[in-house]
Amino acid sequence: MKKLLFVLLTITLLASCQKVSVEQTKVIPEPIKKTTLNVGTLYGAQIFVTTGQGEAGFDFEMASRFAEYLKLELKMKPYSNISELYQALESGEVDLLAAGLADTPTRREKFRLGPPLYRVNQVLVYKQGTPIPKDVSTLEDNITVITDSSFVETLSQLQKLYPELVWEQEKEKDSEELMAMIARGEITYTIADSSTFEINRRYLPELRAGPILKEKQAIVWLLPPKNSDQLMSDLLTFWHYEKRSGTLAHLNEKYFAHVKRFDYVDTRAFLRAIDNKLPKYKESFQHYANGIDWRKLAATAYQESHWNPNARSPTGVRGLMMLTLPTAKQVGIKNRLDPIQSIKGGAKYLNDILNRLPDSIPENQRMWFALASYNIGYGHVEDARKLAQSMGLNPSAWRDLKEVLPLLHKRKYYQRTRYGYARGNEAVHYVDSIRRYYDTLVWVDNQNQLLIDEKASAEESQLAEKIGGKQENLSGAQPQ
């Protein structure tokens, strides 16, 4: 009897153990495979922006490459301010922050910081006509800066030297909005990083940069302080690869190099021309662009003639697109002074050059090569490419070619080329100017679209109020 009880007890225990084992096996979840890289960001010309041509920005392009490197789908999540960005990262809503944020002591304490993407200076910004401040101790008014920004940390450090220094913080505005307020005279001073300042003074030429408050501050991505070892390891490997391959140098050139040159008079004149001259020719630019962004075509025409259909040059070029007589014949144009024919001919000539360029030149840089060819001739650009290759540079990278083109006016170099002497430095300036005009046209387009959206939203609200009012009146007329 005892043996029987022992056997039954043993069987029961074994069954129980097996049941527990099975139950435990059932409740262990399968690891969820990650499919998306969620990136917190802020809107900004050099950070992340959406246009009619798609999404752009230094941080966006780097994030796109990083997601591709990780074999994940990229999801950019814009937030209203830095505080919301921090909360999103801390809560796990996003995997990292790519928002043009600077390396600061406070951020190092709270988060893990990635490697430097580029470096900026912090500059004091004021409006033309305001007395030029020598340093922050001579300011006539308070400084207004963004809440949680690196500028607040800089001011806190400066306050130790200048105890009377005071500032105001804006949580719901970004640097671009504060600089617009400077231009309108609503505030007197703000602080911006040098890149953001240089980009925005193209649209707000009244802006001026005062003393540099902090030099060569690294712009980095922010990662969570915990459970991000693998992501940090992947980011560092990715960064080293992109640095060696020239991607970082290319993006720096793309977003920042051409904006360093600034001409107040020219910028004001261009903004006036957008209002007064461009409307006459806008439809023609759009109609004949044929695959080219019409704003690049319009920017080229402005660089050539300032949108003057009767423009003439002692060298024989004429019209809105300043075509030579041989080029006009080549593209089938009879009257170079007819603005419509000129636009049609200039667009065809540019497209012909684009189609002629080697396939090795990346799509996002082909226009700059084509414009340089439009300016000094395709042969000279080919000479510069061969010269770049002989110097160990990349002949298909615009950042390298713009370093070589100016050498074409030096005997030491041009005597080795097929087509000889050329003013290559003028070609570089020519392309940079067109890129600035193009960026301004994109900005104006975006501003106009915002106004259209705001007007439509206001009309919808008014319509909803009217409908709501009618329904209220109808319900009031019903029997009780």
UniProtKB/Swiss-Prot annotation:
Cellular compartments annotated: Cell outer membrane
Entry EC number(s): 4.2.2.n1
Top-rank taxon: Bacteria
Membrane topology of this protein: Peripheral membrane protein
InterPro entries with a match to the protein in the record: Lysozyme-like_dom_sf, MltF, Solute-binding_3/MltF_N, Transglycosylase_SLT_dom_1
Region (LT domain): 260-480
Enzyme class: lyase
Alphabetical list of Pfam families matching this protein: SBP_bac_3 (PF00497), SLT (PF01464)
Signal peptide: 1-15
Enzymatic reactions: Exolytic cleavage of the (1->4)-beta-glycosidic linkage between N-acetylmuramic acid (MurNAc) and N-acetylglucosamine (GlcNAc) residues in peptidoglycan, from either the reducing or the non-reducing ends of the peptidoglycan chains, with concomitant formation of a 1,6-anhydrobond in the MurNAc residue
Keywords: Cell outer membrane, Cell wall biogenesis/degradation, Lyase, Membrane, Signal
Region (Non-LT domain): 16-259
Record has Membrane as a keyword: yes
Main location: membrane
Keyword Ligase included in the entry's annotation: no
Protein role: Murein-degrading enzyme that degrades murein glycan strands and insoluble, high-molecular weight murein sacculi, with the concomitant formation of a 1,6-anhydromuramoyl product. Lytic transglycosylases (LTs) play an integral role in the metabolism of the peptidoglycan (PG) sacculus. Their lytic action creates space within the PG sacculus to allow for its expansion as well as for the insertion of various structures such as secretion systems and flagella.
Family that this chain belongs to: In the N-terminal section; belongs to the bacterial solute-binding protein 3 family. In the C-terminal section; belongs to the transglycosylase Slt family.
Protein name (database record): Membrane-bound lytic murein transglycosylase F
Organism listed in the record: Shewanella sediminis (strain HAW-EB3)
Higher taxonomy: Bacteria, Pseudomonadati, Pseudomonadota, Gammaproteobacteria, Alteromonadales
